[in-house]
Amino acid sequence: MAIRYVRKIGDEVLRKKAKPVTEINSHILTILEDMAQTMYLNDGVGLAANQIGVLRRLVVIDVGEGLLELINPEIVYEEGEQVGAEGCLSIPGVVGEVKRPKKVKVKYLDREGKEREIEGEDLLARALCHEIDHLNGVLFIDKAIRFLDEEEKEQVKEV
């Protein structure tokens, strides 16, 4: 396992669409482990593979309920609406309000290659949407309704 460099805004890999994983092998599992370690070290709640320069459809998320590893995630259902603050390890110092579904259902493969589904609400729904957007070359700044000023960012940190 290794800590990977998180690509920053301006790096063209962040704007590219990731390719599906066709075989789950030791290389893919190592990437997932590296992604989790990198996410935790950087105090993130999610990380997509292209954020570490790997154009494969891999996502790790932990919103405080344990690590989720998703291979080839796809949103199959969404409902409701929520607006909330988002930041990104690839866009340090920027926080914006983004409209997302309140609830989503995501189909994905686990590390054994079994098809799974997960339902997420609130923060988990937001994280799933944010990371899957990354896999499609979309950043939260593309969807932000507005950006928070320094005082507002401090208030968000305190919550």
UniProtKB/Swiss-Prot annotation:
A GO term, aspect molecular function: metal ion binding
Cofactor note: Binds 1 Fe(2+) ion.
CDD domains, A to Z: Pep_deformylase
Biological processes, Gene Ontology terms: co-translational protein modification; translation
Coiled-coil segments on the chain, per record: none
Catalytic activity: N-terminal N-formyl-L-methionyl-[peptide] + H2O = N-terminal L-methionyl-[peptide] + formate
Entry keywords, A to Z: Hydrolase, Iron, Metal-binding, Protein biosynthesis
EC number in record: 3.5.1.88
Binding site for Fe cation: C88, H130, H134
UniProt-listed Pfam families: Pep_deformylase
Keyword Iron: yes
Similarity annotation: Belongs to the polypeptide deformylase family.
UniProt protein name: Peptide deformylase
